[in-house]
Amino acid sequence: MGLHFSKEEFRVRKSKVLDSMKDQNIDALLMFRQESMYWLTGYDTFGYVFFQTLILDKKGNTILLTRAPDLRQAQNTSNIKDIRIWVDKDGSNPTDDLKVILDELNLKGKKLGIEYEAYGLTGKNTLKLNKSLENYCSVEDKSDLITKLRVVKSKEEIVYVKKAAELADQALDEVWKYAKAGVNESKILAEMNKVIFEGGGDYPANEFIIGSGKNALLCRYQSDKQTLNAQD
């Protein structure tokens, strides 16, 4: 497994979630936020653009419902032992597969917390989910339950934060070597990313934002790469 944190770190995180669920009288939490799944189990994927959910009940049972392409992704990057697959084909409804799991966990008539505010839970899938759970259990929006726990960083997390800051500084230092008239922005970006990857880093959560000339004041990344002139 490609876990980046210790078993003890993950144990503590899970314990905090279970304590929070108990305080909020939640029998189970349905996670749709990829960042929640990663924080709790190490599960690393961009497959969240399709329907998938990580179920955690108050007994500590953890079950991932996802598509076949993410089976090995979950096996290789997370500590999740129970991985269920829903078949992605015309007419399939993954909330039916979810109900089977909820039945196994005896959650009918219970109170479920759901991460409704999640990029992975589209409006269409939300309608399916709500219809499936109607008259089955009670639900509450618990989108921020794990998010609030993630705010306070552990010692292991702070090590990564400091390393990321060091790499960011090194990448910025590299910029000044190439910020000259006649140099294309693509070259600058390439050198910045080279520093990050050679330093043991990874893709940033947000692309590096670079701009000169008419794009100098843009606040978002865009694909129009300029060649710097003497006035930039």
Model-derived segments and their meaning:
Residues M21, A179, I196:
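Hydrophobic pocket-lining residues that define ligand/cofactor binding sites across diverse proteins
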Residues A168-L172, D202-Y203:
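Short, structured loop/turn "capping" segments at alpha-beta junctions
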Residues W176-V183:
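C-terminal helix-coil-helix/basic helical segment that borders enzyme active sites and/or dimer interfaces
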